[in-house]
Amino acid sequence: MNAERLLALYERVAEAPDAIARLRRFILDLAVRGKLVPQDPQDEPASEMLKRIAKEKARLVKAGEVRKREEPDLAPETDEPFMIPEDWRWVPATYPAYTVSDLDKKVQTKDVLESGQFPVVDQGKLFIRGYCNDPQKVIRVSEPLILFGDHTRETKLIDFDFVVGADGVKLLRPICLFTRYYFLALTWLPLDSRGYGRHFKLLRASLIPLPPLAEQHRIVAKVDELMALCDRLEAARKDREAKRDRLSAASLARLNAPDPETFTADARFTLEALPALTTRPNHIKQLRQTILNLAVRGKLVPQDPSDEPASELLKRIAKERTDLVRRKEIRREDALAPIQPGEMPFEVVPSWTWARIGDVVLFTQYGTSQKSNPSDHGIPVLTMGNIQDGLVVSNNEKRIPDTSEELPALYLRKFDLLYNRTNSAELVGKTGIYLDENDTTTFASYLIRLRPSLTSSNPQFLNTAMNTTQFRETQILPLIKKQTGQANVNGTALKNMLIPLPPLAEQHRIVAKVDELMALCDRLEASLTTSDQTRTRLLEATLTEALSPANPSEMEAI
């Protein structure tokens, strides 16, 4: 394997989701199979090295430098996990090393400092956990050693004086072999996870392939070369993705804050470039939000001058609300304050109008305060977890008895909107539309029901408007910036929020276009998933093919 061959391989699998990580693993696989560098018949075989290891271990025990321990047997040939070159040997993973027993100097986690004289190394993912200033706890390192995390399986090569952090650490000092190859082999070794259980026994029972000493050095040099190339490939990929992200963001930004003179050209460019601009799930998410933002700015469908203006809708909704009050189905409420020019987030097209939510819907209502319980009987109670991506999704709700005094008043009806008034700052204000059957389900008190007019508004347009970033940034976030902990945006605040309201006929056209474009986003997302799966299968097939030659003489073809 050389750099040119690796580059050729990378070109075939570059767009697979984990291509670089898999290539790194592939390099290690080649290394421990004797397929990364050619063998040299002049090298002293590994069997001679094993004799020196056994002799050195005996000397250390006799000198009292290490304690005698029960050693795992050298692996018989029948236990070989795969074929290795003739001069290599399989050995138990801990055989060519001895464990350092002087670990009573470890520092407790609570005593680890953010800065200090001596680095603290533990079994966590961070290479250096922190620092310690106590020289009595320092382990002096004259030659590199290996730290193995008994709980985490993390393996670290340490070539500096350090302090051991907390429990679960095993230190291995290699004997008569190249420490960096030993580290490479342990890093490659696949150990089953026992969660936070102990793994050192698994390590002792596992086998690693041991090449001649001279070949160990050649292998490590080649691994260093190819890993450095992987670093460059990874940096180039990140740079490429960052540029693609900036292009995608810039293209969508031009649509979100449109220039009337260039909007048509910007929109055409974005639509034509969609496959190039949407290469990751977050791109699709941004595209979906751009579609919603265009919808509420009057940029998604053309206006029709024959449409009845939105101001007439508000008059009809007000009359419908008055009729409900007269029939005593809802209470009369004070009129909302007129909208001042400075309140409007942006200018709408002439046939549209800005309106307060309380003037657009017939009424708002808090949910049930009755305690709900898991049950197969009764009325399901929807909670904030049921609001997902603009929809109200039913799943495993708790229930209240159907004899509750709050029913039937709090039954949901199809096309009701549910607004989450209490949640974390990131989630408060999320809204979904209820599309299930009438009078079968209710909702919890930290949700607010909005009942739209079904004759003078399109509830799905209202739901779209309340799920835009524009609505969140201008109507919700200003209300929660000064809050700490759980955020709350109550019903009074909700009724006073502003949304842009188009004519009813245009609302219907907008909803149809949003549905069409969201279906396109669904297809793009599915295409991404399919492409990723295809690239992953190609990656698997390519790496399997590259690892398949069993005859060492075939190595040069890799």
Predicted feature locations:
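Non-catalytic DNA-recognition/assembly elements of restriction-modification systems
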Residues: 3, 22-26, 30, 35-36, ...
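Extended, domain-scale alpha-helical bundle/helix-rich regions
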Residues: 11-17, 21-72, 77-79, 254, ...
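Secondary-structure capping and boundary motifs in well-ordered enzyme cores
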Residues: 19, 85, 113, 140, ...
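Short, ligand-facing micro-motifs at secondary-structure edges
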Residues: 105-108, 127-164, 176-196, 388-399, ...
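A short glycine-rich beta-alpha junction/loop motif
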Residues: 163-170, 194-213, 440-448, 459-460, ...
